[in-house]
């Protein structure tokens, strides 16, 4: 198998969506629009998009990751779509953001708006907090195992890639170009951006 071939085995999670049974049990885990409507998945209408900044990731997915590395002989967990999609207006985001900054969650991405600038920083810090939490739980449960976040945005990422580089041993950039409008050389451009931030770490 993989071990005999000297391969590293990673599990994969995808925290960005849940099915109806999860929504029924925990509607507060789902991202919401400004009017409070829960957010349906754009390509799977039977699924719901989760909030990346609240208890679904910080509590539930933390325990999922702990269970995976406790029960299975894997050397890490890679998460796809872990950083959320768009601004979330769920009860947790509204309360936590207001408590942290004194602002309401902004309705639009306006760099001139101090609320948007505060939200961008708050979201960034929350995402790095959950990545650190998952890495701590995974490495603390199975020695040598690590958390690997998918970070395919390169220079266009909303995350500070230099900070992320200091947190992880390797980076994967999931570049699928499903729209058909990305230049063929964009993956190479991403690799150069990651190399600039990561130094000699593998990408």
Predicted features by range, described:
Residues 27-32, 95, 164-167:
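Short, hinge-like loop/turn segments at secondary-structure boundaries
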Residues 190-203:
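Active-site clefts of carbohydrate-active enzymes
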Residues 78-115:
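Active-site-proximal loop/short-helix segments
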Residues 6-13, 147, 203:
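Hydrophobic beta-strand scaffold residues
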Residues 2, 9, 61, 68, ...:
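Conserved, mostly hydrophobic/aromatic
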Residues 20-21, 78, 85-89, 127-190:
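Substrate-binding cleft/loops of secretory-pathway carbohydrate-active enzymes
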Residues 11-72, 107-120, 132:
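Active-site-adjacent "subsite" loops/lids of carbohydrate-active enzymes
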Residues 1-7, 58-60, 126-133:
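Aromatic- and glycine-enriched glycan-recognition loops and surfaces
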């Amino acid at each position: 198998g993989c071990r005999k071939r000297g391969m590293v085995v990673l599990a994969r999670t995808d925290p960005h969506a849940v099915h109806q049974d999860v929504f029924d049990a925990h509607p507060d885990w789902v991202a919401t629009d400004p009017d409070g409507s829960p957010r349906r998945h754009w390509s799977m209408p039977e699924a719901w998009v989760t909030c990346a900044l609240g208890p679904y990731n910080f509590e539930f997915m933390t325990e999922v990751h702990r269970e995976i590395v406790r029960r299975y002989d894997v050397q890490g967990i890679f998460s796809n779509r872990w950083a959320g999609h768009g601004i979330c207006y769920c009860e947790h985001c509204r309360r936590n953001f207001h408590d942290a900054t004194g602002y309401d969650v902004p309705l639009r991405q306006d760099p001139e708006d101090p609320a948007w600038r505060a939200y961008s920083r708050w979201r960034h810090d929350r995402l790095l907090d959950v990545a650190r939490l998952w890495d701590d739980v995974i490495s603390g449960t199975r020695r040598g195992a690590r958390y690997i976040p998918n970070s395919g945005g390169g220079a266009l990422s909303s995350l500070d890639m230099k900070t992320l580089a200091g947190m992880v041993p390797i980076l994967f950039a999931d570049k699928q170009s499903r729209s058909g409008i990305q230049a063929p050389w964009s993956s190479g451009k991403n690799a150069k951006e990651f190399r600039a931030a990561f130094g000699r770490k593998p990408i």
